[in-house]
Amino acid sequence: DITVEWAKEAVKLGQENDSTSLSNIEKALGYYQHWMTYRDKYGLSHPSISLTAVAIAMLSSDFQHYSDEFNHPSLLTSKYGPFYSDEEDISAGEVNPIDNWMSEKDDIDKYIEAHPDAAAYSFESTHPLTQDEWEKDVDFWNDKPVYIGHYTSMIKPDANYVGLAGNEYEIQPMMNNADSMDEIIFNPINGIDFNSYQNLVQSYLKDVKQEDKINTLKANVDTANQNLVAAQNAVKSAQN
């Protein structure tokens, strides 16, 4: 078992800017859906949601406003203590994180322009992209002057259980928002298909919003009653 020592300070459960807020949990649903549009282009499967991975992604995202360095928590354990070791992508700023990670493909395209033979390792030479082909292409690019680790993570064929999260904290001066995608293979995975997860989130959001509406209505009725009593008292005073 891992005890994430900084979690209580970094994560502000349910607060507006936190990765655990309802609005940011809902935002992460959109990240997943956008990601799948890219995976569809490569003929790839849609990973299931891991509730464990979602929790890790929330921790990793919120870590970025707690730490004095934008980095993976698993790479800063000597300073901040243990964290989960998994496949992780992090992003910061106003840009959609999925687009940000996928944009690394530009490095491949530019390299192929100068070295046409490299097109055989473009991750697009076969469709659908297979795990064997993906691994072969990854090996080819390992010693090339490209930065594509997030891109290859996004299009990994055998990614089976994932979680996404994001917050709206200030990460660095003039830079807000941190996002994370985590893929895990260790237990407990707590897997659920995306549609079921989305339904759970949206059902909960609906209940909360309905409760907010009821509370607002009650408050309005109370205010109206108070105003009515005040008006009646004013009339009585005027009559006296």
What residue spans do the PLM features occupy?
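Non-catalytic cell-wall polysaccharide-engagement segments
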Residues: 166-213
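Long, non-membrane, amphipathic alpha-helices that form coiled-coils
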Residues: 197-240
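A well-ordered secondary-structure block
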Residues: 78-185
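Intrinsically disordered, low-complexity segments enriched in Ser/Pro/Gly/Ala and basic residues
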Residues: 59, 73, 77, 121-124, ...
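Short, well-ordered surface patches within globular domains
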Residues: 1-86, 151, 156-168
